[in-house]
């Protein structure tokens, strides 16, 4: 079955725009299509559309969606009127591309204590949306966020011999 979805997309390009602007669109997608199909469609329709092709992380109607779930599931949850915006407005460089440079320092601290595998680094960046959930992350520029603490908890499980050093971070 097909779903017709009315979109309100909050777009922004740090190089050109002072403030975000809204683009409205209507799309028709199969309910079995994953959310990534919507982003691929928008990429083909919109000039210079920016999003992470490897990791879906977006706010739909003010709710964080960080998994590539089906359009049908999302329609059940959000209806057929979606407001799409970056999960990290202050760190957004272009549309849905988030500047992660500020996270290199906390990740380097962990690397100084124990090796970080490519799978562990992938986990770190999958937890990225959780770095922006608390008001602290909005007000303290050096605060790595709750995502970093979730990552540390996982690293402690995977590297118990360095647990005490990791807990000091």
Which residues does each PLM region occupy?
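Signature of N-terminal electron-transfer/Fe-S-associated modules in redox systems
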Residues: 2-169
């Amino acid at each position: 079955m097909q779903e017709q979805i009315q979109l309100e997309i909050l777009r922004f390009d740090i190089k050109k725009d002072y403030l975000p602007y809204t683009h409205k669109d209507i799309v028709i997608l199969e309910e079995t299509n994953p959310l990534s199909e919507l982003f691929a469609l928008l990429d083909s329709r919109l000039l210079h559309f920016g999003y992470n092709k490897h990791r879906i992380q977006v706010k739909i109607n003010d709710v964080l969606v960080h998994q590539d779930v089906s359009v049908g599931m999302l329609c059940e949850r959000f209806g057929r009127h979606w407001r799409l915006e970056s999960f990290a407005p202050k760190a957004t460089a272009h549309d849905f591309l988030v500047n992660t440079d500020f996270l290199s320092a906390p990740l380097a601290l962990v690397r100084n204590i124990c090796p970080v595998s490519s799978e562990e680094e992938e986990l770190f960046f999958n937890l990225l949306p959780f770095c922006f959930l608390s008001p602290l992350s909005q007000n303290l520029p050096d605060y790595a966020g709750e995502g970093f603490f979730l990552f540390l908890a996982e690293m402690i499980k995977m590297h118990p011999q360095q647990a005490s050093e990791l807990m000091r971070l």
